[in-house]
């Protein structure tokens, strides 16, 4: 298995202006993750996370303006599947969906879209993914991971 995220990953946070997006986005930024944009419909044009991250109304717009290639999703369960689909159609290569409680029927639709667009999905209902000292996408504390000869995967 290859490394899925690194310091070159260009990250868009879907749901960046919500409380989870703000808190964990700040943690990821502090870790050194290359967050290039955020998406919250209706809030495009503002900057967040200490005025360092531009917010767009759609993932398509964020990709067009920032060349984002990786997305992390912090949206409520009823909107999570649509957020994954939006990211896939916008050309995002890797989507990490933290949201828990996404309806199974919604994920069936997501699976077909991901396959068609060659998008990888980690989640939903996962803590995220980390490449030590390079990129952290998710809710796990960065200090618990140290560089070494072992990789760990939790299924």
Q: What do these predicted ranges mean?
A:
Residues 13, 37-40, 55, 95-97, ...:
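General beta-strand structural signal in soluble alpha/beta enzymes
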Residues 25, 59, 84-85:
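Generic hydrophobic/aromatic pocket-lining and core-packing "Φ" positions
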Residues 30-49:
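NAD(P)-binding Rossmann-fold cofactor-contacting core
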Residues 50-65, 72-81:
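Glycine-rich, highly charged phosphate/nucleotide-binding loops
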Residues 65, 78-99:
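Rossmann-fold NAD(P) dinucleotide-binding segment
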Residues 101-118:
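Rossmann-fold NAD(P)-binding glycine/threonine-rich loop
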Residues 123-151:
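Active-site phosphate/pyrophosphate-binding segments
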Residues 153-155:
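Conserved small/polar residues in nucleotide/adenosyl-binding loops
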